[in-house]
Amino acid sequence: MNSNFKLIADNLHFSEGPRWKDGKLWFSDFYHHAVMTADEMGNVEKIVDVPNQPSGLGWLPNGDLIIVSMLDRKLLKFKDGNLTEHADMSKLTPFRCNDMVVDKNGNAYVGNFGSIHHGKDIKPTVLIKVDSNGNSSIAASNLDFPNGTVITPDGKKLIIGETYAGRLTAFDLDTDGNLSNRRVWAVSYTH
């Protein structure tokens, strides 16, 4: 097998939340505090600065970019060159928010670190749902560092990685964006 790799971007600090849209790889470089894009020719562009570390990225049905702001636990909207608050998730979790996936109706599902950076034992945390109008609620609880979330192509299942549990957990996703029928989808290791 002959594989050819081409470096398309360097001098990045910690790239996170990759998404492919409009022929470009969109990502957060959270130690640079910026959302960036890279195309296949190696053209890298800073889209917007996010002072409190960007992470998960997604788009609302109208095309507006939404960005998880990690340190202040907010979901920001970037439209017409302006960054505004879409939702404040700080009352739902005291921990840094991170990865996100957005369904076809504009419901965003945002994970968070849990207690890992507070010098305490790891404790389960929540998955937050933010609807397209910016209303936030808890979608699921008792997750061990929810991260790496996807929605299946048919839009009927949400699968989330539980980093510290070594498993993928699946939920059924209804047309209103509610989760049900929680189950283990795969296990990568046991403790």
Spans of model-derived segments:
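Beta-rich catalytic cores
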Residues: 14, 53, 96, 123, ...
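Residue-level detector of Asp-centered blade-edge/turn motifs that repeat once per structural unit
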Residues: 20-22, 60-62, 102-105, 153-154
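A short loop-to-beta-strand structural motif that recurs across blades of beta-propeller domains
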Residues: 34-36, 74-76, 126-128, 167-169
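Asp-box/WD-like beta-propeller blade repeats and closely related beta-sheet repeat scaffolds
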Residues: 82-104, 113-115
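Short loop/turn segments immediately following beta-strands, especially the blade-tip
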Residues: 171-177
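Conserved small/polar residues in nucleotide/adenosyl-binding loops
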Residues: 190-191
